[in-house]
Amino acid sequence: MTLGSLGNSSSSVSATFLLSGIPGLERMHIWISIPLCFMYLVSIPGNCTILFIIKTERSLHEPMYLFLSMLALIDLGLSLCTLPTVLGIFWVGAREISHDACFAQLFFIHCFSFLESSVLLSMAFDRFVAICHPLHYVSILTNTVIGRIGLVSLGRSVALIFPLPFMLKRFPYCGSPVLSHSYCLHQEVMKLACADMKANSIYGMFVIVSTVGIDSLLILFSYALILRTVLSIASRAERFKALNTCVSHICAVLLFYTPMIGLSVIHRFGKQAPHLVQVVMGFMYLLFPPVMNPIVYSVKTKQIRDRVTHAFCY
């Protein structure tokens, strides 16, 4: 029996959801699992390597790298959140997930996602202080301040996402139990509820605007100030050097915000977009940043690059 027929025949309230993986490509799941597995093999060891190098290399105990360690922790968390259901579906066809497990996964995925947005904003502030106020860099970004920034970021993410599982749990799910994805997302679960989801939709939009919306605008504002300062530097070599310190962060910002904003726009306004596009965008927004961030920072950061090269060559 296929997922579609199972979903159509389900007229009673189900205690579980069924994750479909990539709809329409079920026969190719075993082959799709190969690049997905490779991505996890890059993401998890890659972020663990970043954390280990920053912890053991005393020269990296600076604000920029402390924020990078936060980013690596979040990327590690995102990878581990999706790993069980993704590999379960593509390897052994384990598609069932209980409502409570789905809501828990949903909470952690969204919490880590919005926490990553906060840390990327913090890293933009770090670059702003380093370039625009270099003489006050150490006095402004002390370890205490960095710790408080991390706690505030965590508190904001948890506070905003905590209501979502309870808002979803109060609804009946009496139609098809099939979630057209490989993991649980708020927008996907809402589609299965047999109730008016207007309040959930409004709250979801509020969360996105108050996190990703505000953070992305503040990052743009930070880089506008950075660019103004850089253009006022007389030496061309110094201008290039200053901008070069921002390249890794700009790559991380683009890797995170581009698919996330695209996915949010498609979910809310692109009703005619093929569902496969939504699924692919969902994979990009959750899997690409954890895979690419360690690579980008390893390539662009000499201390990290040297340690990684030394570990593999000796």
UniProtKB/Swiss-Prot annotation:
Gene3D superfamilies: Rhodopsin 7-helix transmembrane proteins. Disulfide bonds join C102-C194. Glycans are attached at N8. Its main location: membrane. GO terms for cellular component: plasma membrane. The keyword Manganese does not apply. Residues 1-30, 81-104, 166-201, 264-278 are extracellular. Odorant receptor. This is Olfactory receptor 51G2. It comes from Homo sapiens (Human). The gene is OR51G2.
